[in-house]
Each structure stands twice: as structure tokens, then as C-alpha cells.
């Protein structure tokens, strides 16, 4: 609720709004997948502290709607639990904190080592990668990551 309120306030005021006074992060986007009724507020950083509260935006990757690959990681057992239910063609909507909306259909998925993802944030095109630990039912963190790949098809206000 605090993240939702901070995100809505950011859209209305045009200023980054922290969800609580001592927060070291703030909402930058909302992810929605209507087919499976999933949504999550994306936070400005991908630090361990930020990921405790929601998906993060990996520093040095572009924002959604910008050329390159925007990367959002989150925990598999909480905020990105729904990734296991995504299928090719599902539409991921990303609403940025400036109110712009971008649609990304899922192109596919992959499982990679955390240190060998193959993601080039400066690549051509307008892409989105959602990342979480793999396998989904593991009890501890391992070296593999589950990636959802998507390419932007539309942008709107």
C-alpha cells in the first residue's frame, strides 16, 4: 500500500516520492500482466534492501521505453513469483513514474548463470528483461537465474 501510494504521488507531482521517510529507494514504475492479474511496483535500485520490498531497476540499464535492455530483478518467492506463469505472447505493461505506458509481449524465457546472462543493456531495440532466481522451488539461492525476455511494441501516455 505504501509503495502504491508513493508511486501514484510520484505520477501526480512529477517528483520522486519515498514510500516512507527513511527509505533509500522510491518507485519508478509499475509492472502489470493482466492475463494473470499480476502487478508489482519497481523501485529505483536493485540493492538487497530495495529488493526486500519489490523489483528493482538495475543501475546502468535504460529505463523502459528507452533504447537498450531495461532489467528488473526481484525475488522468486515474493514479487516475481508470477514469472513462472508467464507464457510467450503474454503482454507485460510497464507504467513509468512519468505516467507513460509501454507494452512488451513476452518473446521467451531462459535460464542462465548469474554471471553469464548475456544481457547487453546497450543492444539495439527496446527490450525488457525480468530476472529472478532459479529454480522456483529452491530453498536457497543458487547460481542460476530465470529470465523473461520481452520486446516493446507500443508506447502511450
Feature locations, PLM:
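Solvent-exposed, non-transmembrane regions of membrane-associated and secreted proteins
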Residues: 1-157
